[in-house]
Amino acid sequence: MLLRYITFHREKVLYLAIACFFGIYISFHDACILVPAKVGTNVTLNAVHVHDGDYVYWSFGGGGANRLMCRYTPRLDEIHKNTNRSFSCLTNHSLLLINVTEEYTDYYRTMTTFVHQSHNWHNHGNKWTLDTCYYVYVTQNGTLPTTTTKKPTTTTRTTTTTTTKKTTTTSTTTTTTTTKKTTTSTTHHRHSNPKESTTPKTHVELHVGLGATAAETPLQPSPQYQHVATHALWVLAVVIVIIIIIIFYFRIPQKLWLLWQHDKHGIVLIPQTDL
């Protein structure tokens, strides 16, 4: 029965699958919070909107059960089985990366399931989930790569060549001198003279997330801003899915085409209905 329905409504099923894939793509490609870090320091990543009793999960990379690091349900569990990184799960639901190296450069995600009743004022209710993503970028000096403007310089080199030809005969001696031929070539060389970039002062420990100091991470958006952006993306995805379903379920493009043919040729065409 399902196969028969898909056969007769394959266009609708295809459009619906594309819309679902688009919604999933938006969900998994939210902009992550950028966290620059210096080799040998500690980095603290904070969960947002967390109360006692809420369920919090920390994972790295693409996430999933095999990459869990911390689990608060609400009892705290640290999972070091599938990771070679030194970290600690703090009692305030934060993740502490200890003595980071360049191998720590990765995505770190926190998923919070709201259980506490205090979330009802925000219309979240129970079992509502909030995802937050961080991208920790570890370098030797703790700064992001910057591009510098090159100032070219030009040097000129001139080469002069002179040719003299002398011809002599037996009866009459005639000396012929050709005109001096000078060839000048100019070659341009570019030399880069980049300006030296200044390295900002680093800190022993970097705190990121709700309540963190903004001076250490000037490029980092606030978690509240990411929360609003996630809501907006989901609303946009739902609206797009609804529009696509309405357009292709009621066959609006086909009906517009038939109306145009009727006005052009004066022929009444009856659209084929589904079986």
Swiss-Prot record:
Its main location: host cell. The chain crosses the membrane at residues 228-248. It comes from the Viruses. Residues 146-186 have a biased composition (Low complexity). Glycosylated. Residues 249-275 are cytoplasmic. It is found in: Host cell membrane; Host endoplasmic reticulum. GO terms for cellular component: host cell endoplasmic reticulum; host cell plasma membrane; membrane. Residues 32-227 are extracellular. Keywords: Glycoprotein, Host cell membrane, Host endoplasmic reticulum, Host membrane, Membrane, Signal, Transmembrane, Transmembrane helix. Residues 145-200 are annotated as: Disordered. Coiled coil: none annotated. It is a single-pass type I membrane protein. Residues 1-31 form the signal peptide. Glycans are attached at residues 42, 84, 92, 99, 141. Interacts with host PTPRC; this interaction affects T-cell signaling. Plays a role in the modulation of host immune response by modulating T-cell function. Interacts with host PTPRC/CD45 and thereby reduces host TCR signaling and T-cell proliferation. Belongs to the RL11 family. This is Protein UL11. It comes from Human cytomegalovirus (strain AD169).
